[in-house]
Structures are given as structure tokens and as C-alpha cells.
Amino acid sequence: MTKVLVLGGRFGALTAAYTLKRLVGSKADVKVINKSRFSYFRPALPHVAIGVRDVDELKVDLSEALPEKGIQFQEGTVEKIDAKSSMVYYTKPDGSMAEEEYDYVIVGIGAHLATELVKGWDKYGYSVCEPEFATKLREKLESFQGGNIAIGSGPFYQGHNPKPKVPENFVPNADSACEGPVFEMSLMLHGYFKKKGMLDKVHVTVFSPGEYLSDLSPNSRKAVASIYNQLGIKLVHNFKIKEIREHEIVDEKGNTIPADITILLPPYTGNPALKNSTPDLVDDGGFIPTDLNMVSIKYDNVYAVGDANSMTVPKLGYLAVMTGRIAAQHLANRLGVPTKVDKYYPTIMCVADNPYEGYAVSVKDDTWYGGTVSIADPAAVNHLKKELFTKYYMWTKGDMALEKFLASW
């Protein structure tokens, strides 16, 4: 029996595992290895921070959900992949080391939030990128009496060599891994403090390591700047954060921004497990270069999906799901199941929600990749879409078989 390991438990990995098992059935054993038995619907973690959702509402127990679909599950932290001998090494919850051989592996363990690169993070930093981060921020916001808030992202340490075997325009250079959560939090906080009657006591500054929202068209960026102007939000470009202090943040050039609360999408680097793997599996940033079918350019039994793939820029949930689906479809063909393989075409697709004010901004944009689509639409119906998508993900336990049909809402 062909053995397929899927590493990870978020959008890319779960999409790959569920899709592959649905396609190949008993033709392959599919096993997921993830560092936790729980997976979370991360697009709603900002909602936890502002108190409209609880973390437990967003939790999927993979040890129950995956076996229900005929997929094996193993809790364990991946330490490295030996691509030459087709082995994965991981640490079990009890601390013991284990190894597992594979015929094929789909790598979806994401990147690394490099908080260690920002001085003062442990004492003064806040974020919404992990469940525990969102909960900590929620507690801070509840007790906040007013002052300065800075929201932004750290630098993205993108790999460049070797390059993936895809059209060059599909992989633009990015200063930030993804600024969608920054945009969303800036809108959410306006609604949050308006509800608390504190707008006159709070001053928000949004910062970016490069040009803010550079993955959108100039017209969309102008629209965002106009929204910020109306909301009284200050925008600072080219601010590469180096340190968080009690009442300010500092960039690499010594510039400062007032900040009594700093909300940060931390610097983004390659996953340590991938950097520890077979050297020619990854690029110089620790990401896996692939072709358009998500197959490694060096090892044809290795697939990479989501943030672990060097091709996915920015590091976006929509792209993770697309890559997971394509990898599964391509592998199904190799396992003897004729399957149409979707074409990879990168597009920025996201919804920046503002639940307290009852609207969201729906974004669809491919201009960064040479396309002509540029939509940034604020509307009440988009808030409803985000609510429904959250419910759909939780209802399916991450098995979003209809996602590609729903994404064009």
C-alpha cells in the first residue's frame, strides 16, 4: 500500500489530506502528522482579540476529525525531512523521537514567526497569529484606558535561490509575508473602541516594513489610505521594526512610533524543521521550491503546500488551500486515479472584517502578478460572508470541498 504523509494541520495540509483521501480512497494510506491535535480557524483569531469570539469556538480536534474520513493522525512536532531516504523525523508529545518512512510526503508545516528577532517582544509584544496571542491581546485591550496603538508587520525573509519552476511574475519580491491581518485589525479596533466610547482616547498608527499593502493595485492602496484618513489612522511606510519598548517601537534606522500597545505580525522566516532538512530540498530562506503542481524541483516524491512553498507570496490562506488541492489532484493521478488538476493562478483573496460596525472589505486583486482585476469592496454583505465562511469551516472540520466554488462570492 502506498504511504502518503501529510505534515501540518492548517489550510494547506488539511486541504491536501482531505482531498487526496476523497480521491484515492483505499489506494493509499494517508497519515497527518501535526504538532497539536487541535487546529484553529485562524482568520477568526482577530475576532477573539476584540471579544466577539472565543478560541474554543474555532477549534477542530484532528484526532477525531481525520479518522472519521479514513485519515490516520499522529501528534508530533516535525524535526526534519531526509528527502534522500524518504524519512520524516518528529518528536512525540512524551518527548521521544520517532521516524517514519514515506512513498510521498506533502509538506504543509508553514513558516516560522520569528519573534526572537524583535527585542522586547516577550515583555511588550502582542499579536493575533496564534490562539494564545489573541487571548493575551484580548485581555490587554479590555483593560486599556487609552493611548497609542501601533499595528504592523515585521520583515519577510523570503528565499530567492533556487527559484521555483513557475512563471517569474507568480513570485514577486515581498517586504511583508501578509498584511491582511494588519488591515483587518486596524478596522476592527475602530469599531471596538467606538463601541466602548473611547475613540477620542485612542490613536492608531499602522506601519509596514515596505510599502503598505504592496500586493494590491495602486488604486486599492489609495482607497485604503482614504479610509485611514477618514478614521484618523496614521500610516507609516518603510518601518522595519527592531525593538518594542514600553511606550514606543524602534526601527532599524532608529526611527520611533509611539506605542502603548504594539500589535505585530512577527517577522516571517522559513520553518526551522525545513532548514534542518536535506539542504537541497529548500531555498536560501528555508522554503521549498516547486513546480506548478507543487512537486519539489529536486525530489519528485515531495510536495509543498501553503506557506512552506516558496512560490506562495504573500503567505495567504487562499493560496494555501489552492496549493493543497492541486497537490492532492496531481498525486491522485500518479496513484492511478484520473483527476483533473486545477491550474495555479495566484490572486489576493481576503475579507477584512469589522464586526462591531457591521461591514467588511472584500479584496480580490491579481495586479501584483500582472493581471487586471482590482476589487476592494466595503459592504455589510461581506461581513456576512466572513461569518458564513467561519461556520462552513467549522462544520466541515476543515474539509472545504466546495471552497473553490465559494471563493468567488
From Swiss-Prot:
Monomer. Its EC number is 1.8.5.4. The keyword Membrane applies. Belongs to the SQRD family. It is found in: Membrane. It is a peripheral membrane protein. GO terms for cellular component: membrane. Inhibited by the quinone analog 2-heptyl-4-hydroxyquinolone N-oxide (HQNO). Inactivated by iodoacetamide treatment. Inhibited by KCN. Keywords: FAD, Flavoprotein, Membrane, Nucleotide-binding, Oxidoreductase, Quinone. FAD binds at residues 8-12, 34-35, 129, 271, 307, 317. One of its GO terms (molecular function) is sulfide:quinone oxidoreductase activity. Its cofactor is FAD. Coiled coil: none annotated. The keyword Hydrolase does not apply. Binds 1 FAD per subunit. It catalyses: n a quinone + n hydrogen sulfide + n H(+) = polysulfur(n-2) + n a quinol. The active site is at 178 (cysteine persulfide intermediate), 350 (cysteine persulfide intermediate). Optimum temperature is above 70 degrees Celsius. Optimum pH is about 6. Pfam families: Pyr_redox_2. InterPro entries: FAD/NAD-bd_sf, FAD/NAD-binding_dom, SQRD. The gene is sqr. Catalyzes the oxidation of sulfides, such as hydrogen sulfide, with the help of a quinone. Has the highest activity with caldariella quinone and decylubiquinone, and lower activity with naphtoquinones. Consecutive reaction cycles lead to the accumulation of a polysulfide product on the active site Cys residues; these products are released when they exceed a critical length, typically as cyclooctasulfur. It comes from the Archaea. This is Sulfide-quinone reductase.
